[in-house]
């Protein structure tokens, strides 16, 4: 039996059983590895899961200078989306900065996404460039918020950072403050620097009302998030109202690690509703 035939049979089985294909897009400095708990739970329930390593992230071997353009950074996600059959729709889930990639994938492949889920994630408005949201985020952060994170500022200190690498103290006290020690140790071993692509994200028509704006969007508020504080999450929701807002209590920033069971159930409910 050919791979294509097997794929078609698996897809048919998923449709018959009301199963779904979840595609995960990680945030800055992370990789596909951060979804391992959630992916395992969804697979046990019969769903298909694809966790993407974006350019220079996770097991992607490219160095930071090799993914200087956002097209190189998002290439693994866009190539995967392009490879999907025209009749298949996926549930696209972006976390934190991964919301930018999620919105751009929804823009490029609107017919292949049943719903875009923003997990405490950047959710840009179709009327303004994503860079506006990035700038708003950094403007709202209090002085000293970044602790020992390492930044570069190619556009000058008056502009948002060009790249970031999360520091050990920042991980312990903010990003992974709700996580188990094992999760923190894994993160500290696998962190990689990431570009923020703010200059490129300032381009007009990167996202449009007709494509990204026509898609279904659900925002999941993560209570106790110390990286994307609830004030900023709520501002993004009011700035560009999604079709639905969900909430996970005491999740912190890394809900896929702190609340994998609750998040798994929530994703399945959302996927079923917007199937």
Swiss-Prot record:
The keyword Hydrolase applies. It holds the Pfam family Abhydrolase_6. Its EC number is 3.1.1.-. Keywords: Hydrolase. Signal peptide: none annotated. It catalyses: methyl (-)-jasmonate + H2O = jasmonate + methanol + H(+). Pathway: Plant hormone biosynthesis; Lipid metabolism; oxylipin biosynthesis. The active site is at 96 (acyl-ester intermediate), 225 (charge relay system), 253 (charge relay system). GO terms for cellular component: cytosol. One of its GO terms (molecular function) is methyl jasmonate esterase activity. It is an enzyme of class 3 (hydrolase). Belongs to the AB hydrolase superfamily. Methylesterase family. Methylesterase shown to have methyl jasmonate (MeJA) esterase activity in vitro. This is Methylesterase 10. The gene is MES10.
């Amino acid at each position: 039996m050919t791979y294509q035939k097997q794929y078609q049979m698996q897809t048919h089985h998923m449709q018959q059983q009301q199963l779904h294909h979840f595609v995960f897009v990680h945030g800055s400095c992370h990789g596909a590895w951060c979804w391992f708990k959630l992916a395992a739970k969804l697979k046990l329930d019969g769903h298909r899961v694809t966790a993407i390593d974006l350019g220079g992230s996770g097991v992607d071997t490219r160095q930071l200078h090799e993914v200087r353009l956002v097209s190189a950074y998002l290439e693994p996600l866009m190539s995967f989306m392009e490879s999907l059959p025209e009749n298949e729709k996926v549930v696209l889930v972006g976390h934190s900065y991964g919301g930018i990639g999620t919105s751009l994938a929804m823009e490029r492949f609107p017919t292949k996404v049943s719903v875009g889920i923003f997990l405490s994630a950047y959710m840009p408005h179709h009327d303004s460039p994503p860079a506006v949201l990035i700038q708003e985020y950094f403007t709202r952060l209090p002085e000293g918020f970044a602790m020992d994170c390492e930044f570069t500022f190619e556009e000058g200190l008056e502009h948002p950072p060009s790249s970031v690498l999360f520091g050990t103290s920042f991980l312990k006290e903010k990003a992974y403050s709700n996580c188990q020690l094992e999760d923190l140790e894994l993160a500290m071993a696998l962190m990689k620097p990431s570009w923020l692509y703010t200059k490129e994200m300032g381009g007009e028509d990167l996202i449009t009302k007709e494509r990204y704006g026509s898609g279904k969007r659900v925002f999941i508020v993560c209570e106790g998030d110390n990286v994307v504080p609830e004030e900023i999450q709520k501002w993004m929701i009011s700035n560009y109202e999604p079709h639905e807002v969900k909430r996970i209590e005491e999740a912190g920033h890394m809900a896929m690690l702190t609340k994998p069971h609750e998040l798994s159930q929530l994703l399945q409910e959302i996927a079923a509703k917007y199937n």
